[in-house]
Regions:
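A short helix-loop-beta-strand connector motif used in the catalytic cores of GNAT acetyltransferases and
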Residues: 69-78, 100
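Charge-rich, low-complexity intrinsically disordered segments
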Residues: 192-261
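Short amphipathic alpha-helix that is part of the acyltransferase structural core
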Residues: 18-67, 77-81, 86
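Beta-rich nucleic-acid/ligand-interaction surfaces
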Residues: 62-71, 168-171
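Short acidic N-proximal helix/loop "leader" segments that mark the beginning
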Residues: 1-26, 245-265
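Acyl-donor binding region in acyl/amide transferases
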Residues: 95, 102-204
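Short glycine-/small-residue motifs
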Residues: 89
Length: 265
């Protein structure tokens, strides 16, 4: 039985103009997974350039930003490409009771440790950085980039997606992902601005609402497998096309004909 991560796109109503625009852009988007042991990858330079623009990190001769969490077994980094050009990047950690290395655990262990002990599993996104010109040309770039984190919550069966955010950015996470505050404001090592921890619990009702409003977050099992389960071979870093439109169209067909599960695999 075929399934997509569109938990019922409950109605076959047309998408909003905003969602339609992002579906069109995603037809031109590819995602690449990065080998964590190769520090000359362009995404590390993109990080450096983005942080230097805000003077969030000191100057270094290498012109890259890397840290110990780039090489943990539960970490993975991705580049976002539009028309073949690298425009943004993001790092994810799959945080479990057995694998407790992640940025959020560095700053908020008192919040997360009891939850991990209870069996909760988290996707912990970090290092979201973008090319300056691309951020002006594509104001919705955060949506295109954070889509990778949404796919990861589905692929790994996480119970919550975390977000270490600046206080002034919390409204975005509350509005888009229905995230809730989990901590006070704290300092993150190496960054010049304060952060707080937010989390979006992964529930069928909440996913249903998010996918209905933002269908471009949807994906197929095939796309998720290519990003998160690919073997470390010579194709590992090859950019992969997105499947938002295909997943959305499948969900509409399944909702139209009824009786077919559209829950995530």
């Amino acid at each position: 039985m075929r399934s997509v991560d569109g938990s019922a796109v409950a109605s076959a109503a047309p998408v909003s103009r905003f969602a339609g625009t992002l579906l069109d852009i995603l037809d031109r988007v590819e995602y690449s997974r990065v080998r964590m042991d190769v520090t000359d990858n362009p995404i590390y330079r993109l990080r450096y350039q983005a942080y230097r623009r805000e003077e969030s990190v000191p100057f270094n001769d290498a012109g890259i930003v890397v840290d110990d969490l780039d090489n943990t077994p539960n970490g993975m980094s991705f580049g976002v490409h539009i028309d073949g050009q690298l425009v943004s990047s993001i790092r994810l950690h799959y945080l479990t009771a057995a694998q407790r290395h992640s940025p959020s655990m560095e700053v908020f262990p008192d919040v997360l440790t009891p939850m991990l002990d209870r069996g909760d599993r988290f996707i912990d996104p970090s290092r979201f950085t973008s090319d300056y010109e691309a951020s002006l040309a594509y104001p919705a770039l955060p949506f295109l980039t954070l889509r990778i984190a949404v796919m990861a919550t589905v692929h790994f069966g996480a119970t919550m997606c975390l977000a270490i955010v600046r206080p002034e950015h919390t409204a975005f996470y509350r509005r888009v992902f229905q995230s809730e505050s989990m901590s006070d404001v704290r300092s993150y090592p190496g960054l010049a601005f304060p952060v707080t921890l937010y989390g979006a619990r992964v529930e069928e009702r909440r996913h249903h609402s998010i996918f209905s409003r933002y269908p471009f977050f949807m994906s197929t099992p095939e796309e998720r497998h290519r990003l998160f389960a690919r073997a470390l071979d010579d194709q590992f870093e090859v950019p992969q096309p997105t499947t938002s439109r295909l997943a959305y169209e499948r969900a509409l067909l399944e909702a139209q004909f009824g009786g077919i599960s559209v829950a995530a695999e």
